[in-house]
Amino acid sequence: MKKATKLLLSILPISSISFLSVVSCSTRNSNAKQPDKKPEKPNEKGPIIPKNPDNKKPTNNNNNSNNNSNSNNNKPGSTVPNENKDPSKSEETPEKPERDPKKPDKQPQGDDPNNHQPHNNQHADQPNINKDEFADLDKLPKEISFERFDFYTSKDATTALSHLRTDGSVIKIIFSNTHRNIFGKYNINLELDGNEKEDVKKGLIDKVKVKFTNKKDKKSKIIEFTFTGFKVIQKSPDKENKNSKKNYIKKKEKIDNKLTGLYPSLVAYMIMYTQEPKNYKNLMQKDSINFEELENNNPNLFADPEINLNVVALKDLLLEYNRELGKLYKDKVIAVSYDDVNGKLGLKLLIENREENDTIASKYSETLEFDFVGFRKIDLKNPNKNVLSLLFPQNNFKDMIKNNVFKKKIEVLKSGKQKEDMVLVKEEYAKQLIFKNLLVQIIDNENNLYRSTQTLSLQNNKKDNYTSILGLAGGGTLYPFHTIINNNSIKNIYLMINKEKNKKYKVAINFEVDIPIFASTTSDLTFHATSGDTNILKLDITTNALID
């Protein structure tokens, strides 16, 4: 047999012998990855050749060829290609020696470009550092059952959703019991945005968003689920039934001017807050014009003493109630929408049986939606016609330009070293200085509803007793309408200088404040969500001061 082998080697071309060397190396690397076999020492024995009934141990000549190949390929993680390898020829991977020869190892081996196994002696079960952080969430079932909660199984989907809006703690209970690893890793909260779809006939709520926030790095992901297990209701037409829930409430055809003279965003927020104050505590900023300042009639903010921004008074101005059916039913506003550009307000109400009413009325709850038009609009083309304006007092400006951010630029302008007599101010700190010096003006010549008897500002100033209108977290306002104003709202700051006859200089500043005007989705407004494009109200502000 040895003679036959030597004869074979003498006949074969060199490329074929190199091929045998590569096969040997691949087999050795494969062996090294078997946890139940002790790896061979490279210099102790020759390479292992897969067993074949017609083959025996190769000769020393072949051994030397293999050892030369091993000098590169036997190194862990080596990516050095075999120079003698002919890429045009297909290569068949030898079977991996195992206890059962009938089960070949089909995984790519060695430095095969298709090999996705760990290199550098990394074990196959070692965690992948590039693994998706939220991979465990992607494996969650997309249906969550409420069948084990008697409170919810006795409620139809619409009623259940209403309760979830006020108390979403049940989702934590569910995950703490069914997915403890997820509960331990993430903070879990409902993110109800008004886009949920209730189906009382199937007893489910679709498109429910749940937010998972990693407790360590605070990264979060929102996933949509379908909640199931609620009471199934087969509705029957009840248009002819005088006791129908649909007959309980209707919208008024004409709304009092003292309400439509307000911006719809203010009305929407106050309806939701005064109905469930605890749900909006985290949105409030203290020592500013917030929910509490607006809840009851505030003569410092409104000229009409009859304006009362609580849910009972507001619903009475918007809706007509059948008082007889009021003995059977109760109602609750579960979502609102507003559009300050077009003066629109939307209400979504849930109508339920009163506890004592269990015989006369049908068992299912009903949702009614109403849209109102004719509310006050933001005039984007004529900013001066709006209730809100901003003022930069001269004294504030004169003090501000003593700061080095402005002082250095003024000196350059005075020196005449640059051709133009104005300069663009780009420093972020300049925006901060301007922001804290701006005052708010509330003037309502059209309807005489809004008014301010106190000095308002964007930033609280206890020294001068200024009160900020930013009553919502994140720089949000409620009064006179909902918007968001911060340092980044200030744009295009230009500083100008002119020499006066009395050897003084007139320094002027001009800039814009971009105020976003929103149209919301239908939601409970516990978070900020808009629909469509945001419109921008641009306020142009100029002031000046004389300096030496």
UniProtKB/Swiss-Prot annotation:
Keyword entries, A-Z: Cell membrane, Lipoprotein, Membrane, Palmitate, Signal
Lipid attachment in record (S-diacylglycerol cysteine): 25
Stretches with biased composition (Basic and acidic residues): 34-44, 83-109
Main location: membrane
Subcellular localization: Cell membrane
Signal peptide: 1-24
Highest rank taxon of the organism: Bacteria
Membrane protein topology class: Lipid-anchor
Low complexity bias (residue ranges): 58-78, 110-128
Lipid anchor positions (N-palmitoyl cysteine): 25
Recorded GO CC terms: plasma membrane
Annotated region (Disordered), positions in chain: 26-129
Membership in a protein family: Belongs to the mycoplasma p72 lipoprotein family.
Protein name per the record: Uncharacterized lipoprotein lpp
Lineage: Bacteria, Bacillati, Mycoplasmatota, Mollicutes, Mycoplasmataceae
